[in-house]
Swiss-Prot record:
Organism in which the protein naturally occurs: Caldanaerobacter subterraneus subsp. tengcongensis (strain DSM 15242 / JCM 11007 / NBRC 100824 / MB4)
An individual GO BP term: translation
Phylogenetic placement of the source organism: Bacteria, Bacillati, Bacillota, Clostridia, Thermoanaerobacterales
SUPFAM superfamilies: Ribosomal protein S2
GO CC terms: cytosolic small ribosomal subunit
UniProt name for this protein: Small ribosomal subunit protein uS2
Membrane-spanning segments: none
Keywords on record: Ribonucleoprotein, Ribosomal protein
Pfam families: Ribosomal_S2 (PF00318)
Example GO molecular function: structural constituent of ribosome
Amino acid sequence: MSIVSMKQLLEAGVHFGHQTRRWNPKMAPYIFTERNGIYIIDLQQTVEKLEQAYEFVKKLVMDGGTILFVGTKKQAQESIKEEAERCGMFYVNQRWLGGTLTNFKTIKTRIQRLKELKRMEEDGTFEVLPKKEVIRLRKEKERLQKFLGGIENMESLPSALFIVDPKKEAIAVSEARALEIPIVAIVDTNCDPELIDYPIPGNDDAIRAVKLITSKIADAVLEGKQGEQFEAAEE
């Protein structure tokens, strides 16, 4: 039983690539045809590659691994947050802060600061501070929450990344590659699939297409978690 049907992929517009002049020749094997100046992605390969990515994610999570969902473009922001939260994983959906992976130690100090500000707000510290100071601290907290909220509970580096549009998230890709962290990604016709361990050829510009594929990766996480609980119960 396939995890996604051709009908679902077609309805979500996963097969629509970019204009033919905006393409990466390395994506040629995943292109089915060209129609009205737009490349059409071979959905049979999308199904195949999505199944491979699904199995990889499921097994990784079953072994106790974690996934960081990354998508900062408008069409991906909501799906990335919703699906990562649904499966209990981490996400970056605003801006990728350089060094999120390669300089994780520094990022962790910013996360600590966010937690400290939240504590101050909750334990009444804000109430005894001067008004101007409180306004400044609240602004700082909101900014940190915006950029780091999705990785607030990420204690160590993730086991893998799931990326929507690796061309846009080039910094995240290069950091993951430098640290040899595997990457699963939706690759459109303008991307370089060779930079990705588990490329899923598909439209990265349509909200429905992004949502469909991201939700399948989240499903893989949830299935992996069930397997992990099952194994723990057997022990």
